[in-house]
């Protein structure tokens, strides 16, 4: 459960406790990344800072969010943009969205990428917590469809969409 959910359970005489998040343990096991080696292996420019793009892990979510995130590239030409790709989605899927944009695709290297990123654009979800635990400044993004938004607005009573704001 999340910290703010405890009163809900108490109302129904359920003894519930927030015990933390398993990511906290996972992050303590991370090994530092050798910047020079990582940049060379992944053909990244050592002279440019990295902005990580984490558009989500589900096909529909990535389709909806990545296009919006890519619009920032033209605003910050002095940075290099790197997408942390979901291993469950094929490279061709990302390439069909990215087109000719000057952006790099990385699979299975999200934590290493975040360790070297100066900032990140992150779709709301677990990735926001991972990004925060690695001390990377982030902009949290989400775009739902209009019907879902209006239903959620009536039902959900939290101020934030970001796990970082809900947990930390």
Task: List each language-model region with its residue ranges.
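Nucleotide-activated sugar donor-binding and catalytic core shared by glycosyltransferases
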Residues: 1-168
